[in-house]
């Protein structure tokens, strides 16, 4: 997009002149935090709640399927992953609130949360069995919707490159939470 012979009052300028791309990229990070990571945590939590209800009520061989060890393991694994992403989300938001650009941390969280959502919904399909794959239940749609989270706002592979570049520049805070506290 190009503008020629456009005049604006200084009061209409967002940020500093010549710094528009930097401002846009900084804003993108916050958008990724809210649009991808927070949504992934919220959707995964909702899916886990649905799975818990289903596991309590669906009976197989005379018992609720939630009493079966493999179902319990899937529920527990989903809860652990959701909790880890939620804590990482809060930590990253706190860094941004403190004025840190947190570019690498945002990329890490985008990958972590979007891939976590994929694993949680994959387990949900397993818990629901064949019914989870049918269009009669929302799990099938959640499964399709979860896949796009790894693509939009930058693919997981691109965000891994961003993380690695930040680490190569010396941002050990990506993997050393004690370094972040200093």
Language model region names:
Residues 26, 30, 128-182:
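Glycine-rich phosphate/cofactor-binding loops in nucleotide/flavin-utilizing enzymes
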Residues 116-124:
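Amphipathic alpha-helical coiled-coil segments
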Residues 52, 56-63, 79-112, 125-130:
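C-terminal helix-coil-helix/basic helical segment that borders enzyme active sites and/or dimer interfaces
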Residues 31-38, 103, 107, 111, ...:
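Short, conserved micro-motifs enriched in small and acidic residues
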Residues 1-84, 149, 161, 165, ...:
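Glycine-rich beta->alpha junctions and the first turn(s) of the following alpha-helix
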Residues 27, 47-54, 91, 95, ...:
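Generic, well-ordered alpha-helical scaffold segments in large soluble proteins
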């Amino acid at each position: 997009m190009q503008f020629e012979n456009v005049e604006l009052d200084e009061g209409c300028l967002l940020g500093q002149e010549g710094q528009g791309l930097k401002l846009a990229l900084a804003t993108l990070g916050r958008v990724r935090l809210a649009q991808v990571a927070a949504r992934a945590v919220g959707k995964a939590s909702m899916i886990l709640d649905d799975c818990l209800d289903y596991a309590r009520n669906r009976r197989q061989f005379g018992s609720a399927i939630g009493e079966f060890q493999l179902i319990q393991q899937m529920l527990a694994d989903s809860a652990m992953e959701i909790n880890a992403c939620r804590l990482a989300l809060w930590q990253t938001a706190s860094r941004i609130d403190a004025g840190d650009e947190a570019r690498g941390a945002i990329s890490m969280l985008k990958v972590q949360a979007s891939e976590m959502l994929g694993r949680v919904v994959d387990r949900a399909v397993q818990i629901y069995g064949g019914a989870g794959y049918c269009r009669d239940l929302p799990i099938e749609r959640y499964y399709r919707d979860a896949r796009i989270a790894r693509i939009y706002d930058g693919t997981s592979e691109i965000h891994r490159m961003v993380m690695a570049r930040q680490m190569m520049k010396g941002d050990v805070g990506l993997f050393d939470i004690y370094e972040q506290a200093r």
